Amino acid sequence: ITVTEEGPYLVYGRPPLAEQFIMPNESNESWYFQQGRLFSTEAEPTAICRCGASHRKPYCDGSHEKADWDPRLTARPDALLDGAEVIDGGTLQMTDNEKYCVFARFCHPHGDAWTLTEASDDPEARKLAIREASMCPSGRLTAWDKETMKPFEFRFEPSLGLIEDITIGASGGLWIRGGIPMRREGGHTYEIRNRVVACRCGQSANKPYCDGTHASIKWKDGLAGEPVGETLPEEVY
């Protein structure tokens, strides 16, 4: 993915692109993702709207040239772990870089991911802590096994998601999964990670990354998909 300085994301390599709906549990808390409508990335490159104002989302239609937005890419080049707090628990550690919060709220059920990590000597708390940290789409939270010091990560194929948050009535960022590289038009390559969320509403203060602003402004992309496809995790428990 190339992030143009004043326009769209240019996607190369034809990764699959689909809506990813945040689905709630019985308490209306974020619990799993479910795939929605698929979109083509056959065009090489495929231009994905970054300003939030396109009339043919998720694709760019040139609206960025007249839209009321600040396209500047202000995110620092630091690695995600460089600014992360470490939460120490019984059998787990969890890294937390709050700057990358996208307000997906998978960390809230059953207490919260921080409390569950601290209580991870308990097998059920450990299982839930790993689940909640791993579901964080941006990688803000990551659970680590204290014995091996290896992170818990879903094995994502290179793919893109358009996050849809039906509980709060907003559309989220561009979920970049499976180590797809993202670089500035000028050449700088951002840290390559398994989980990244880039801004689609045009209003993040940490571009190109999403900072959750879409939730406070209730930004909607107007896509007409439904959550009918595969779920993450595959078995919803």
Tell where the protein language model's regions lie, with residue ranges:
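Ferredoxin-like iron-sulfur electron-transfer modules
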Residues: Q35-R50, D82-F103, A113-S134, K146-F152, ...
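Iron-sulfur cluster-binding cysteine motifs and their immediate structural context
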Residues: K57-D68, V102-S120, R131-T148, K207-K218
